[in-house]
């Protein structure tokens, strides 16, 4: 495969409850501008959390993330965030999204968050077992095989 070619990595996980603070960070001007660049829209002010059964560090080693660096904004420390461009399967088909892992997260290392242009819960509600299927676009020079978790 050509160096820099886009390859795909599929993650299979279960929705989990968050801490209720994702919306505040997604809506923050520092982060929302970065998500707007990546997604081409103003992101919905909230995240959908899922347990990917894959440690975020393993994901980062397999699929290099974009990094939103940490900063201090009006005296408040904002942590760095790893970001992967992705698509999430919904009852309407695939929807563009970003899979993120805030480096200051209080979640276990297998919990990732999804940012999208629209609220995802309503278009995932017909999924009683709370399964989440996400396809991440990876840019890597090495051969990465399609994997399911």
From Swiss-Prot:
Binding site for CDP: 18-23, 118-121
Keywords: Flavoprotein, FMN, Kinase, Magnesium, Metal-binding, Nucleotide-binding, Transferase
Pathway in which the depicted protein is active: Cofactor biosynthesis; FMN biosynthesis; FMN from riboflavin (CTP route): step 1/1
Record field: catalytic activity: riboflavin + CTP = CDP + FMN + H(+)
Binding, Mg(2+): 47, 49
EC number: 2.7.1.161
Residues reported to bind FMN: 105, 113
Cofactor(s) named in the record: Mg(2+)
GO biological process annotation, one example: FMN biosynthetic process
Entry annotated with the keyword Kinase: yes
Keyword Calcium: no
PANTHER family, A to Z: RIBOFLAVIN KINASE
Family: Belongs to the archaeal riboflavin kinase family.
Function (record text): Catalyzes the CTP-dependent phosphorylation of riboflavin (vitamin B2) to form flavin mononucleotide (FMN).
Protein name: Riboflavin kinase
Upper lineage: Archaea, Thermoproteota, Thermoprotei, Desulfurococcales, Pyrodictiaceae
């Amino acid at each position: 495969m050509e160096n820099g070619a886009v390859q795909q990595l599929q993650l299979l996980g279960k929705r989990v409850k968050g801490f209720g603070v994702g919306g505040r960070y997604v809506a923050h001007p520092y982060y929302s501008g970065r998500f707007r660049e990546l997604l081409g829209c103003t992101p919905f002010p909230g995240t959908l959390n899922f347990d990917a059964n894959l440690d975020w560090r393993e994901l980062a080693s397999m699929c290099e993330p974009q990094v939103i660096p940490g900063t201090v904004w009006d005296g408040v420390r904002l942590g760095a965030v790893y970001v992967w461009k992705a698509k999430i399967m919904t009852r309407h088909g695939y929807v563009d999204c970003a899979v993120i892992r805030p480096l200051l997260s209080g979640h276990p290392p297998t919990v990732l968050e999804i940012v999208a242009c629209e609220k995802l819960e309503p278009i995932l509600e017909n999924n009683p077992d709370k399964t989440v299927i996400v396809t991440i676009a990876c840019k890597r020079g090495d051969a990465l095989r399609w994997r399911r978790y």
